[in-house]
């Protein structure tokens, strides 16, 4: 079964031997030591069985599979195996579960953003479905979309960001990430967005319209230094349209901050991302190119 699931796979093991040889890439063999299983806890072993091991694969075989697949040569593969089997370092979930196989991707996290159009929203949904199905954790930025009640087309008005996030919640939950885990994603909104007050309570199970909740998504608020100064000085805070910057609502910065902290205390979220500090720390060549960080990821 293992041969069928791995590309160019050859497994040579004797049941009576503790030292075995696993070959994933042609010419790259890894010597395994099953006595190192004792370094794993019982909980760790059960987790590996449930989510990571391939059919007929043992714990050390998993480490060897990953080491062989991602190595440059036999010596490199053996070193990687030795480090993993001794627990000196451990790859991420997609690498352990998908490395050396034709399933999923070796990447944990993906970031994207929705544009302020129906086409852009549909593109984001479609992309997130495929990413979740391949085992990726997703972070999506929704700050480009106009808030509820803003003009759309000739005479229409938008229903806001939250209904589209709710659809993303349902789509992500519906997609199974192989046999490892369900789809998982986070969505981000800036502190100046017109819907930030409702967005803060996105995961709160009580109060408000249940059709405007997304209980399975994680969510984060992108906070600026200007907002924190407004909180410090007890000033007004302006919620603005992402489309043209027009002020949609004026609130007290401290009231919004207290609401945010209260929700975090009661529900554990939303995440707080202090975006100006993040962008101060990005590499200079990215700054010179005019690049900026807008959001963070799922974890």
Predicted regions mapped to residue ranges:
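Extended catalytic cores of very large enzyme megasubunits
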Residues: 1-299
């Amino acid at each position: 079964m293992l041969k069928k699931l791995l590309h160019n796979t050859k497994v040579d093991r004797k049941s009576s031997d503790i030292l075995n040889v696993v070959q994933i890439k042609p010419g790259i063999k890894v010597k395994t030591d099953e006595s190192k299983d004792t370094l794993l806890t019982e909980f760790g072993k059960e987790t590996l069985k449930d989510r990571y091991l391939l059919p007929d694969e043992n714990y050390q075989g998993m480490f060897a599979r990953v080491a062989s697949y991602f190595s440059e040569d036999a010596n490199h593969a053996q070193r990687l195996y030795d480090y993993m089997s001794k627990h000196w370092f451990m790859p991420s979930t997609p690498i352990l579960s998908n490395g050396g196989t034709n399933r999923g991707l070796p990447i944990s996290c993906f970031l994207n953003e929705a544009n302020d159009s129906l086409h852009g929203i549909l593109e984001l949904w479609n992309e997130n479905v495929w990413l979740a199905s391949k085992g990726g954790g997703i972070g999506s930025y929704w700050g480009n979309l106009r808030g509820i009640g803003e003009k759309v087309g000739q005479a229409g008005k938008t229903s806001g960001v939250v209904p589209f996030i709710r659809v993303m919640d349902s789509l992500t939950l519906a997609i199974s990430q192989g046999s490892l885990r369900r789809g998982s994603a986070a969505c981000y909104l800036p502190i100046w967005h017109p819907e930030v007050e409702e967005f803060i309570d996105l995961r709160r199970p009580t109060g408000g319209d249940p059709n405007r909740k997304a209980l399975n998504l994680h969510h984060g608020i992108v906070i600026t230094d200007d907002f924190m100064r407004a909180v410090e000085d007890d000033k007004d805070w302006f919620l603005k349209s992402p489309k043209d910057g027009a002020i949609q609502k004026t609130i007290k910065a401290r009231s919004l901050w207290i609401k945010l902290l209260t929700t975090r205390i009661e529900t554990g979220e939303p995440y707080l991302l202090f975006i100006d500090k993040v962008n101060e720390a990005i590499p200079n060549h990215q700054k010179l190119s005019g690049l900026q960080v807008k959001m963070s990821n799922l974890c």
